[in-house]
Amino acid sequence: MTQDLQQYIHRFTHLRRAPQFGGAPHKPVLLLSIFQLFSKGLVTQNRIPVTAELVYFFKTIWKQLVTTQHLPVVNMPFFHLQSEGFWHLHAWYGKESELSHCRDIGSINKLNALVEYASLDEALYELLTQPITNAALERTLLDKYFATTEAQYCPDALTTVLDDIVIKPANIPQVPIAVAGAEKAVVEEDNFARGSLFKTVVPRIYDFTCSISKLRLTSTVQNVSMVDACHIVPFSESHDDSIGNGIALCPNLHRAFDKGLIAISDDYTVLVNKHIAEDKSSAFNLSQFAGQPLKLPYSENLFPTLENIGAHRKRWGY
């Protein structure tokens, strides 16, 4: 066993934790989540931002291991883990002073507004990139903090992010005004995870191609795509970030769809509003798409649902 590994095993078994309910599980669960990001190739450099995958892994591991009355919020351990000395927060440009004077983070939105990413001690980072030492540190946390529930730990379940977060219809309510504090933070984090994955996954399952115009443009130099993840029923009304409420559209057609200038029939062809006046000689006219079939994802269970496209038509009087 290397000296570095021994050092971090000692530090991981002596984490500073709030004593309530026998000790807060947040830091160990966050570390387990980070280990899985490494194992699954989702971290390839020593920069760990708050991502939808991290939030999802945290929530899933929490359900597997935690039996106390603590609430599963990521923002608290992500911020307070810096007290352990091996976790370092890096502020967005211009936010350095605000972060240095911050003593607590009340929500994931505030965390993302202040912190660009976290980094690990270089020695710890190197340990986590190696499967054997990664597994040894993982086992250390499980044995120390979750001895009675570690049999429920199933990291393979984390590969179902698309099914659990995006494909299945959302059942996440709008944050009620009366809900505050940690309970509100839980709902905000769930919404963050779904929303972030929606924006990432929808363009991907449409092969970064506009479903209506078939425009496809990507860049090998920059992370650029000319399609948006468009909600069919507005998120402000439905709070639905599932794939069945999404479609990939280029920006001009996204706007036209949101304004009801175009819609989708139950056979997945394009409808154009009969009450618009346009120059049909223009290469950008909407009428050219009338009756055209959509480009759809590779699997029918990823198609926009008939319920959602029907609600969109009804909204705009088709």
Give the location of each predicted region.
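An acidic intrinsically disordered interaction segment
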Residues: 1-8, 216
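Short helix-coil boundary/hinge micro-motifs
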Residues: 5-169
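Active-site catalytic microenvironments for nucleophilic, acid-base chemistry
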Residues: 37-40, 216, 252
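Short, charged surface segments at domain edges that flank catalytic/cofactor-binding sites
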Residues: 140-141, 152-217, 233-244
